């Protein structure tokens, strides 16, 4: 019975809260809107004429980036938690048998670790996405017509970012 409880706690630990999903989606929407400004300012693609394309591709990229944020968040949180487990064990040996204090300290440490993992996930994925979009749009697909350049560059940038987030090397 204890094993079942342990596994269910692990399963629920990997669930993403609604707040996190909202934060991820808002951040991914903001980052996916950056190329809209670039294409409007640099390539003179009118926002009024291409509103449907901008909106649909940006929404697609935001959804894909949301999954990438979650993947990196999980890996970063596990790595940070594992590295900080040694710190909490060492501090328990020094403090003694103050179980309430240790439990509160562990809870605060888990919350801080979670926030740090969210921040690292957002920074990493934003950088990868913007670098991919820049390389695709300005170097690889520079001779493709602008509308197709935008669609391909943003979609591939988001897809590649999501693909790279599934790697176990983080």
UniProtKB/Swiss-Prot annotation:
Keyword Transmembrane in annotation: yes
Cellular compartments annotated: Endoplasmic reticulum membrane
Q: Tell me which parts of the chain lie in the Lumenal compartment.
A: 1-24, 73-121
Hey, what's the signal peptide range on this chain?
A: none
One GO CC annotation, please? endoplasmic reticulum
One GO BP annotation here?
SRP-dependent cotranslational protein targeting to membrane
Task: Provide the membrane topology annotation.
Answer: Multi-pass membrane protein
Q: Which Pfam families match?
A: TRAP-gamma
Q: Where are the bilayer-spanning segments?
A: 25-45, 52-72, 122-141, 146-168
The job of this chain, per UniProt, is described as:
TRAP proteins are part of a complex whose function is to bind calcium to the ER membrane and thereby regulate the retention of ER resident proteins.
Q: Subunit details for this protein? A: Heterotrimer of TRAP-alpha, TRAP-beta and TRAP-gamma.
Concerning its family, UniProt says: Belongs to the TRAP-gamma family.
Protein name, UniProt field? Translocon-associated protein subunit gamma
Q: State the organism named in the record.
A: Dictyostelium discoideum
């Amino acid at each position: 019975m204890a094993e079942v409880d342990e596994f269910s706690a692990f399963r629920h630990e990997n669930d993403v809260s609604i707040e996190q999903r909202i934060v991820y989606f808002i951040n991914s929407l903001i980052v996916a809107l950056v190329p809209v400004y670039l294409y409007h300012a640099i390539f003179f693609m009118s926002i009024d004429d291409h509103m449907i394309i901008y909106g649909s591709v940006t929404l697609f990229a935001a959804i894909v980036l949301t999954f990438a944020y979650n993947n990196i968040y999980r890996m970063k949180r596990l790595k940070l938690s594992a590295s900080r487990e040694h710190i909490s064990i060492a501090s328990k040996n020094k403090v003694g048998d103050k179980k309430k204090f240790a439990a509160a300290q562990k809870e605060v440490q888990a919350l801080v670790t979670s926030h740090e993992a969210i921040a690292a996930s957002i920074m990493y994925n934003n950088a990868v996405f913007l670098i991919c979009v820049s390389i695709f749009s300005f170097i690889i697909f520079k001779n493709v017509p602008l509308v197709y350049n935008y669609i391909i560059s943003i979609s591939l940038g988001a897809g590649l970012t999501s693909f790279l987030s599934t790697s176990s090397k983080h």
